[in-house]
Amino acid sequence: MRAAIFRNGEIVVDTLPEPEPAGGQVLVKTLACGICGSDLHARRHAHRMVELTRHLPGRTPMDLTRDVVFGHEFCCQILDYGPGTQRKLKPGTRVCSLPALLIEGGVQGIGYSNDNVGGYAERMLLSEALLLEVPNGLAARR
């Protein structure tokens, strides 16, 4: 899949492996993703964000020697479900979510993570328990 990737201090478009949903996760297609002020700050001052994160309990800082896919304000469409999901929403349903993945042992962020791509990728993984259905008639870009 294609993604806008923060790599070596620049944003580049490249391909990444397709994500595969694990237990409790949902594979989604990104329909729209806002450019947040935090994303702009990260683009210019990622090293400062990493230092700040080191002082926040429970947060894992980004490794700036590895790829990062930003994007934590997104609207997506459900494509598929991983194991152990309830499948309350049909594939094709538009959703948003907190930018976090519920994993065994805790929570991982989406977007400022080397392991969990954000909405600047064509597809991403979300936790089913955190999904919110986008109301019918509301445009994905709103």
Where are these regions (language model features)?
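Short structural boundary motif marking the start of a folded domain
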Residues: 1-4
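Short beta-strand-to-turn element immediately C-terminal to the catalytic PLP-Schiff-base lysine
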Residues: 6, 43, 79-81, 126
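Short gly/ser/thr-rich secondary-structure transition/capping motifs
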Residues: 8-13, 59-60, 114
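Well-ordered beta-strand positions in beta-sheet-rich domains
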Residues: 13-15, 123
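Glycine-rich beta-strand-centered segment in the early N-terminal region that forms part
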Residues: 17-33, 48-101, 130, 135
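Short cysteine clusters
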Residues: 36
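Short Gly/aromatic-enriched secondary-structure transition segments
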Residues: 41-49
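NAD(P)H dinucleotide-binding glycine-rich loop of Rossmann-like/cofactor-binding domains
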Residues: 60-67, 98-142
